[in-house]
Amino acid sequence: MGKISSLPTQLFKICLCDFLKIKIHIMSSSHLFYLALCLLTFTSSTTAGPETLCGAELVDALQFVCGPRGFYFNKPTGYGSSIRRAPQTGIVDECCFRSCDLRRLEMYCAPLKPTKAARSIRAQRHTDMPKTQKEVHLKNTSRGSAGNKTYRM
């Protein structure tokens, strides 16, 4: 089995073959258009290599991908799985020094937090209802005294 070429490479090969078959001085405008299109496709695909994300661009990409969940700069690991751990690679190692794809970015998103289900009014307890203002009972400070006589209890 042969190696599968990319589409721009195949188009370039086809265009190059067509170009060699046709004499330059009798080339029609449609052939020139297709040749130019093939050359542009080939050159733009070879110059645009894999991109890396660093600094603010990396943070912006993570915020876009993860949304309100948030993200980690290091991969989250289990608690105390082993005393000695191998050095971890973070998102900067994977996406700034090398190129990374969308799936790699999603690996650093925080997990979804479960949302609290809104309770219906029927399910609420009576203590959840707003309290009405109660009568204020003043403490009887004159306990044990009647008139000007003081009694001890």
UniProtKB/Swiss-Prot annotation:
Segments of skewed composition (Basic and acidic residues):
125-138
Outline the inducing conditions: Expression in the bone oscillates in a circadian manner and its expression is negatively regulated by CCRN4L/NOC.
Q: Which domain of life is it from?
A: Eukaryota
Instruction: Please name the GO terms of the biological process aspect recorded for this protein, alphabetically.
Output: androgen receptor signaling pathway; blood vessel remodeling; bone mineralization involved in bone maturation; branching morphogenesis of an epithelial tube; cell activation; cell development; cell population proliferation; cell surface receptor signaling pathway via STAT
Q: Which residues form the propeptide?
A: 119-153
Query: Where is the region B?
Result: 49-77
What segment(s) does the record annotate as region Disordered? 120-153
Q: Which cysteines are joined by disulfide bonds?
A: C54-C96, C66-C109, C95-C100
Alphabetized InterPro entries for the sequence: IGF-I, Insulin-like, Insulin-like_growth_factor, Insulin-like_sf, Insulin_CS, Insulin_family
The protein's UniProt keywords, in alphabetical order, are: Disulfide bond, Growth factor, Secreted, Signal
Outline the subunit composition.
Answer: Forms a ternary complex with IGFR1 and ITGAV:ITGB3. Forms a ternary complex with IGFR1 and ITGA6:ITGB4. Interacts with SH2D3C isoform 2. Forms a ternary complex with IGFBP3 and ALS.
Name the chain's protein: Insulin-like growth factor 1
Recorded source organism is Mus musculus
